Structure formats: C-alpha cells, structure tokens
Amino acid sequence: RRQRQMCIRDRYGFMICFFIGFAVKLPVFPLHGWLPDAHAQAPTAGSVDLAGILIKTAAYGLLRFVIPFFPTASAQFADIAIIFGLIGIFYGAWCAYQQTDMKRLLAYTSISHMGFILLAIYAGNILTFQGLMIMMLAHGLSSAALFIMSGQIYERLHTRDLRLMGGLRGQLQYLPFFLMFFVAALVGVPGLGNFIGEFLILMGSFNKYPVFTILASISLVFAGLYGLILIHRALFGEPNPEQKQHYTSPLKDLSAREVGILMICAIGLVWLGIYPQTFLDVSHSSMQWLVNSYVPVQEVVETVQQTATQLEHVEIQ
C-alpha cells in the first residue's frame, strides 16, 4: 500500500512539473509576467510568431503529453487548473482594460484567452476539446492580425501609445475597417471564429463546472470593454496635437500588400465562424481519442476517492 501511495505521489509530482513548464509557455497566471514585456520589446514579426504559433505549442503540449501520460493525476488536478485558468481570464481582461500601450494590451488579451484554453483542456469532453481547437486557430489569426496592425500604425504614427492616437478613422480608408473587424473577432462577435470556439468551450464545460462556466461568461464583458477602448482611442476623436509633429499629413493608407496579408486572416476567421465543420471533422478522431483516455479516468478517480473514504470510516469503526 505504501509503495502504491508513493507511485501515485510520484506521478502527481511529474505531472505538476510538466504542467508548470507548459504553464509558463501558455502562459497561466501567475507565470505570465514575461509575455507583456516580450511583446512590447519584440518586433512585429516576433509578436506575430509569438501570439500566432508559439504560445499555442504549450496547449498542444498539455494535450499531447500531460493528459495522455498522467490521466489520473490530471483528473485530480483538474479543479485547481481550472481555477488558475479562471483567474487568468479575469486578470488578463482587467489588465488589458488598463493598458495604454497597444501591444501590451494585446498581450494581456492573450493571457485572458489562454484561460479559456485551460478551462477547455481540463473540462475534458469532446465539445471543449473541439472548441479548444477552433479557438486556437481563431485566436492565432485574430491576434496575429492585430499585432501586424500595431506595427502598421507604428510605422505611420511612430508610437504605440493609445493616448497619442485618435482620429485615424477620418485620415485612413482601409486601416479603420480592418482594425474594427479584428477587434470584433478577438472579443468574440458571432459569425467569426473566436465566437465558435468560446461557445463550444462554455457549452461543454457547463455540465460539470456550471459556476466556473458562468464566471468565465461574465468575463466576456471585460473583453468588450477593452475592445471598445482600443477602437475608440485609436480611430475616433481628434488627432493628438503632440503627435502631429512626428508624422507628415496626410497619412499613407495601407498598401495592397498590407491589405492582402490582412485579408488572408479575415477570410480564415469568417470561414471558421460560418463553416467550422471543415476543421471539426479533421480534428474529431484525435480529440475523441483524448476524451476516451481522459474522461473514463475522471470517473474512476471519483469512484476510488469515494471508496477510500468509505474504507476509512470502516477502519475507524
């Protein structure tokens, strides 16, 4: 019995080590501190790579290694992981609401959205896993496009400070439209890919974690707030007098190459939002394998815990 307990503890410890490694990369609160600074200092291409691809590898690592290698320990750890994810959702949204640097704002939105990813992984059913896949694709497109646009704005205004922006809607033709479109996608407007991913995750999580799911749904209000702040400060109002001296008027609008890059991301988001079944069919077999290896273990763990409690009472008597 003692050897069995040590084996269980060892597996749990190994699982925690794997989890911490991937949690830093995802990132999960409170291991997130590197991401806003990394985005703020990185060039546009680096931010696009980081937001669009690299942080998604952590979610892949959790799915590919942590859940299959340590299903029992993962099932025991699920509630704690979801609490960390929920804290990250609110913390990221609240910090994004307070930012004045455009890239730091977008970095905190990624922290908030990765909380949904953690909720999806540890809720552990086919709906959340499929929603996770759609959300990673959609977030990769929308966040990458917004980091591209932050670079485009910086080339024209020589600043990322939202307090020094304003009035772009009246000076440019294409940039305001794309900025509003991708912000709408990021906050989960229906008809675009992010909405499908969030909807599937929340629907799949509700049966087992109704309270956590309701709280995660409330956080979407903060997403709308930071999205509106970004759009209002950048596009509306009057141009900041302090900033006018740093660029020549009129501003140069997006080139055909820049529009083409953004159109690719926009088409992908619309496709994900209108016809996600294309991607769901491809991922279904892999996600079902994960469900089969994880969900039964959750049920076994609950049964074993109940049996152990009953045996303890019998021994005491």
Regions found by a protein language model. Name each.
Residues 1-5, 9-233:
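Hydrophobic transmembrane alpha-helices and their helix-loop junctions in integral membrane proteins
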Residues 172-175, 228-317:
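Cytoplasmic/organellar membrane-interface segments at the starts of transmembrane helices
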